[in-house]
């Protein structure tokens, strides 16, 4: 049996965290903790429901919560998010309703897309969260296009594109990065390098020393950040957004993290990952790292954690009950949102 490594501690004093997060840093950390617990509860329940045949598909974000929560907390309402498979927490932190997201997972009549998208492909117009595509890398060029529109409109918003290590080998990655570099657009490219593109290890993905190094060839600033460290992730995203909002050109951050679950509910990582992978991943569990720091500095105890876990679990179960009590979209909805209303033709319109 492989021994479980001790959790890697977050390397900060309270003063360093305050300098990184600014005023209200305690509230920011506690909010991050609550959201990460909710994400973990959502992942656990949805993976179980998928195995029971109650949800058709699910892609968990376990291990990526620090980046997702940091992005949700560091962005402003005018910013836009172009997600990959695992960024649902970004939408929730930005204000998307948990119940609405769960309706989407079930594809019921209260799903904004009326069941037309597969699970984990939501959109949330009210928080500028654009529907993802299963085609790898498309969000990179889409975010660049939105960045161009923001620049033309003199809009203060910033476009954030989230993609995995595998997407850096896609055509759209090249097109989007190059376009953003040429035109100096307000786009933050967030590469969540969980070290596996389904079964392909990152060392088979590129000969470059890092994925961040690719950004420099497009004339962009590129850097690596520990994606299991919520303080580092928040600081990196907030600083980049601040520069972009001030007129700086696009940037790329490579967040190095560990995928702690199968790629999706259709995957069996035991067939390709080394036997010690999960032990290494657990040593960098972003939730455990944050909880350890909060406990050591008197901001979290067992009772408070239990309350947070219970509330998150109740919220998820309530949303599931609401979704399972909702009927599926009826046949009459098939044409909703497909055809625009048309007025009768007149002589003037011909």
Question: What spans do the regions from the language model cover?
Answer:
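Cofactor-binding active-site loop characterized by glycine-rich and histidine/acidic residues
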Residues: 41-44, 48-183, 201-207, 212, ...
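Glycine-rich ThDP/TPP pyrophosphate-binding loop and its adjacent helix/strand module
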Residues: 128-325
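Generic, low-specificity signal for short hydrophobic/alpha-helical stretches with a mild N-terminal bias
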Residues: 18, 24, 28-31, 53, ...
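Conserved acidic/glycine
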Residues: 1-67, 261, 267-350
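A general secondary-structure junction signal
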Residues: 85, 255-257, 338
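A generic structural signal for short, non-catalytic loop/turn and secondary-structure boundary residues
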Residues: 29-31, 74-76, 115, 246-248
């Amino acid at each position: 049996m492989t021994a479980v490594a001790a959790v890697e501690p977050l390397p900060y004093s309270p003063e360093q965290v305050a300098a990184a997060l600014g005023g209200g840093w305690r509230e920011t950390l506690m909010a991050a903790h609550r959201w990460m617990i909710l994400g973990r509860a959502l992942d656990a329940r949805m993976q179980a429901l998928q195995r029971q045949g109650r949800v058709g598909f699910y892609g968990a974000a376990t291990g990526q919560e620090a980046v997702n929560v940091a992005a949700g907390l560091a962005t402003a309402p005018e910013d836009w998010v172009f997600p990959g498979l695992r960024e649902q927490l970004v939408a929730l932190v930005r204000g998307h309703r948990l119940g609405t997201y769960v309706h989407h997972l079930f594809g019921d009549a209260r799903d904004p897309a009326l069941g037309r998208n597969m699970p984990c492909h939501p959109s949330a117009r009210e928080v500028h969260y654009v529907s993802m595509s299963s085609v790898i890398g498309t969000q990179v060029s889409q975010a660049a296009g939105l960045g161009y529109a923001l620049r033309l409109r003199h809009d203060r918003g910033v476009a954030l594109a989230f993609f995995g290590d595998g997407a850096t080998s896609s055509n759209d990655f090249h097109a989007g990065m190059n376009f953003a570099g040429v035109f100096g657009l307000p786009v933050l490219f967030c590469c969540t390098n969980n070290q596996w593109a389904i079964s392909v290890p990152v060392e088979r993905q590129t000969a470059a020393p890092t994925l961040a190094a690719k950004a420099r060839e497009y004339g962009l600033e590129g850097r690596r950040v520990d994606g299991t460290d919520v303080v580092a992730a928040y600081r990196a995203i907030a600083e980049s957004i601040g520069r972009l909002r001030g007129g700086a050109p696009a940037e790329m951050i490579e967040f190095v993290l560990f995928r702690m679950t199968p790629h999706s509910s259709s995957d069996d990582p035991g067939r390709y990952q080394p036997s010690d992978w999960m032990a290494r991943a657990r040593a960098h569990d972003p939730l455990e790292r944050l909880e350890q720091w909060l406990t050591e500095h008197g901001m979290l105890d067992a009772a408070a954690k239990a309350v947070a876990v219970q509330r998150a679990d109740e919220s998820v179960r309530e949303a599931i009950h609401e979704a399972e009590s909702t009927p599926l979209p009826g046949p009459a909805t098939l044409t909703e949102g497909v055809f625009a209303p048309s007025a009768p033709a007149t002589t003037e319109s011909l």
